[in-house]
């Protein structure tokens, strides 16, 4: 009896191994391009992000619908392709997109990965042959699919991820600006004491910057709405119905909620990705603004005893700042955003160079630009969102500290400079910088206590005007 059981188990195991081998063989035959590409593309392990795979699925869905509507593709095959394209959009087959980002410059590897995968899945459904080129890639070329998918992915990520995050942090900064509108602190230029400002004015400046950035990106992304679909290999549209490009653009618009249209010049949209490079430059601009905000936050948070110490950020206490110094708190979220800024700026440099690759009819940096643009969008969306909720919304102004620093700043001498002259004021400022109390220095100039109180009235000093006009007698 045991021998018989062992024999049955052995047979089942043998059949299982045979089935696995057949499945591998079937997949290899179905995915010939992908399998062969491993030998000639780079194998860095850098795979396309979810957004790019989703965008390719959108393009294949739109193309199948359009080809069926035009009477070019059998309805049954077209329906199967659409079902599987939707599965690709949902992320059900992300593990099957195995081509490396560092591949042929046109993105043919990405397009053929989608074609072969969808054909294999659709064939299994229909129990018949769906061809990756004849059916899934009908009326298309990698040369219009790649640039289209890159634009769809980058535009969607910008509109649905980055712009909302920009608006979110701008709202948070506006709220913080109002909350700290009466919190006076020293201004600083060249990291040296300058005239006083309010904390609200400083944060309001960044709110305005991010509001402007949101408008700038929304304007830049409009140029990505022109798609080269229907241009096929070189932009002429050979082997595609003249109506195909417009139909695909409409279908992509339905799926994304964005207003994609056929490119005014398909030759331009096929050979140049400078519209995506321009968007990448916009991401760089956002990163620069975010970097400046983070640098200021770090300095204002520095301390608690040997730094500026004008704000506290309690959320940063949620993780230990040091593995050796107990109780140390570091601006960890802020520094995470600084790293994201550096990466986005670096990826933009790669994009500007990649956008110059290619000759004549075709762009040759398609897969890299698509990958980088989506990664840039991810980084910015995450960093801006975290900064808003974890840092900006939880800033605690150290009001007394800020006022004390502002009231002892030698820069306050600027108030009386119009009355006593620049040279005399500069000499007085040096005395104060070397330890002379500002009130004592002002008394020596002949100002009484009422006038000194007026000079040191911080509320007047953070508004436009010439306060010294109101002073009498001294100088």
Regions of interest found by a model, annotated:
Residues 2-475:
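Conserved, well-structured ligand/cofactor-binding cores
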């Amino acid at each position: 009896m045991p021998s018989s059981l062992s024999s049955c188990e052995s047979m089942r195991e043998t059949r299982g191994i045979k089935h696995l081998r057949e499945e591998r063989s079937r997949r290899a035959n179905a995915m010939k391009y992908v399998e062969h590409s491993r030998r000639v593309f780079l194998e860095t392990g850098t795979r396309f992000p979810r957004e790019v795979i989703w965008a390719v699925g959108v393009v294949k869905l739109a193309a199948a619908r359009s080809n069926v509507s035009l009477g070019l593709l059998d309805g049954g095959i077209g329906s199967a392709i659409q079902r599987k394209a939707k599965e690709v959009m949902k992320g059900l087959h992300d593990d099957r997109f195995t081509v490396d980002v560092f591949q042929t410059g046109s993105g043919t590897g990405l397009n053929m990965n989608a074609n072969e995968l969808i054909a294999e899945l659709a064939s299994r459904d229909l129990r018949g042959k769906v061809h990756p080129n004849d059916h899934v890639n009908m009326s298309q070329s990698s040369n219009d699919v790649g640039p289209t998918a890159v634009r769809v992915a980058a535009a969607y990520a910008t509109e649905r991820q980055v712009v909302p995050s920009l608006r979110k942090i701008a709202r948070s900064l506006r709220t913080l600006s109002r909350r700290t509108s009466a919190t006076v602190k020293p201004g600083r230029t060249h990291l040296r004491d300058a005239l006083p400002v309010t904390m609200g004015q400083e944060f309001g400046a960044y709110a305005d910057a991010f509001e402007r950035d949101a408008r700038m990106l929304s304007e830049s992304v409009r140029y990505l709405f022109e798609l080269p679909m229907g241009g096929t290999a070189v932009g002429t549209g050979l082997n595609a119905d003249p109506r195909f490009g417009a139909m695909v653009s409409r279908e992509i618009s339905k799926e994304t909620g964005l207003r994609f249209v056929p490119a005014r010049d398909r030759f331009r949209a096929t050979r140049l990705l400078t519209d995506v490079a321009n968007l990448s430059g916009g991401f760089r601009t956002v990163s620069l603004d975010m970097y400046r905000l983070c640098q200021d936050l770090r300095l204002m948070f520095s301390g608690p005893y040997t730094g500026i110490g004008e704000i506290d950020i309690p959320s940063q206490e949620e993780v230990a700042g040091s593995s050796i110094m107990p109780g140390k708190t570091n601006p960890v979220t802020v520094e995470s955003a600084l790293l994201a800024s550096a990466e986005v700026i670096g990826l933009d440099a790669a994009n500007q160079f990649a956008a110059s690759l290619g000759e004549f009819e075709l762009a040759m940096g398609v897969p890299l630009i698509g990958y980088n643009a989506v990664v840039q969008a991810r980084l910015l969306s995450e960093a801006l969102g975290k900064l808003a909720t974890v840092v900006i919304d939880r800033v605690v102004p150290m009001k007394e500290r800020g006022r004390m620093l502002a009231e002892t700043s030698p820069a306050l001498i600027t108030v009386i400079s119009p009355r006593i002259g620049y040279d005399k004021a500069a000499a007085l400022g040096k005395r104060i910088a070397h330890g002379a109390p500002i009130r004592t220095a002002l008394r020596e100039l002949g100002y009484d206590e009422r006038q000194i109180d007026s000079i040191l009235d911080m509320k007047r000093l953070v508004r436009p005007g010439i306060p010294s006009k109101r002073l009498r007698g001294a100088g």
